[in-house]
Design a protein with these regions (language model features):
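Residues in the short beta-alpha loop(s) of Rossmann-like NAD(P)-binding domains
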Residues: 12, 265, 351
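A short, flexible beta-alpha/helix-coil linker loop
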Residues: 111-113, 163, 320-323
């Protein structure tokens, strides 16, 4: 058993716990079968969740979580009030258990501790690790996270590599793109209200397509990007085979996902179309029915929209401020509602931007801040 810390944006913690519970039994045990191990207890702290579970399950959270930022494995804990004490404990780190590469990066965070000078801590860590042949680099494939709070040090090794919100498909972007994990939180709220996964989605302010791509891939693990733990010396043997992905035969991937993306900016639609090609490489298991339109969403005509037999949801993070007036946003949603029989809508917007519909009613709302801006994630249903 090991202890993992799954980090996420502030105020995502409970949603992350819910997400991990939802995919827990999709993960694989060492015999190549869906795990039979029970969902562990979670310790929820600001910025993430601490979980005690088998190594092979903690590592796989990287594949499945759409809300997490990264997954760390705890490798050492100790009291640190003096630099010689800190250096001695750092020398005892069992890094050779996990990694061969002797180049490592170190990230340090301190709070309410006697040892709080980052440069001195870096020097002490450099001296300690060099004795084991490790070299500290500003950039390295392996990252060590040192957190000292109230003189208690926790040392963790990154298992993710790049931030998990970097799925691999969102390369072409415009102004102020929404992060993938924030778009995924929007999708999670849709499935609170609509248990049927057979839904069509439309975004009248689609930009480079992140909201739509996250709806399509929400239930599909991301096997097609690099993760740090796949290079660990002690990674589970079941992942040594080049065909290990085929073991996840029970994962049900969506087919013929109906998506409509609309934007007044031709460049935004061009970016979306480029990203759709990358999406197909990242998630080859998913087949999309993607329709894009360069159009003003306040002037759409019914014949421009694809007909569907599925419930239709709006998912959107409309531009605001100088890029689009509040009245135009309101008009676009009301106009779309007049053209399509909407089952619901999930809108991410500043708290100063009022959103409403004719027939849909506000069902739930999440308040949070993003880069200092107070936002609301509002869900509307019939």
């Amino acid at each position: 058993m090991a202890i993992f810390f799954v980090s996420c944006p502030l105020h995502f913690e409970n949603h992350l716990a819910e997400e991990i519970k939802s995919f827990w039994f999709e993960m694989m045990d060492l015999d190549g079968q869906p795990t039979r191990q029970p969902v562990p207890e979670f310790e929820i702290v600001p910025g993430g969740i601490e979980i005690k579970c088998a190594d092979h399950l903690g590592y796989q959270i990287n594949f499945f979580s759409k809300l997490a930022l990264r997954v760390l494995i705890r490798i050492h804990r100790f009291t640190a009030r003096f630099y010689d004490q800190f250096e001695k404990e750092m020398k005892a780190l069992p890094l050779d258990k996990w990694i061969d590469d002797k180049n490592v990066a170190v990230k340090i965070e301190t709070a309410k501790s006697r040892l709080n000078h980052e440069r001195n801590l870096i020097e002490a860590a450099t001296k300690a690790l060099s004795g084991s042949g490790f070299k500290l680099m500003s950039k390295a494939n392996n990252k060590i996270y040192i957190r000292i709070v109230k003189d208690n040090a926790t040392i963790s090794l990154d298992t993710s590599g790049e931030h998990l919100h970097k799925r691999g498909y969102s390369i072409f972007k415009g102004d102020a793109p929404i992060r993938e994990n924030l778009a995924a939180l929007m999708v999670q709220q849709i499935y609170h209200h609509n248990k049927d996964r057979h839904i069509s989605f439309i975004d009248p302010f689609v930009g480079s397509g992140t909201t739509l791509f996250e709806t399509a891939s929400f239930f599909t693990p991301n096997f097609n990007r690099d993760y740090a733990w796949l290079q660990f010396k002690n990674k589970p043997k079941v992942f040594n085979s080049e065909s290990w992905v085929k073991n996840f035969r029970w994962v049900q991937n969506p087919k013929n996902v109906e998506l409509t993306g609309i934007d007044i900016d031709q460049e935004a639609i061009d970016n979306l179309n480029e990203n759709s090609l990358l999406f197909a490489k990242t998630y080859p298991e998913i087949s999309l029915q993607l329709k894009t339109l360069v159009a003003d969403s306040t002037e759409l005509k019914k014949e421009q929209l694809a007909s569907t037999n599925k419930p239709c949801w709006v998912i959107s993070n409309p531009p605001y401020g100088v890029r689009l007036s509040q009245s135009s946003v309101h008009q676009a949603f009301r106009h779309l509602e007049s053209l399509v029989d909407l089952a619901g809508a999930v809108i991410l917007h500043p708290e100063t931007l009022a959103i409403d519909f004719s027939d849909l009613r506000l069902s739930s709302q999440i308040d949070f801040s993003n880069q200092g801006l107070k936002l609301k994630l509002s869900v509307f249903t019939k």
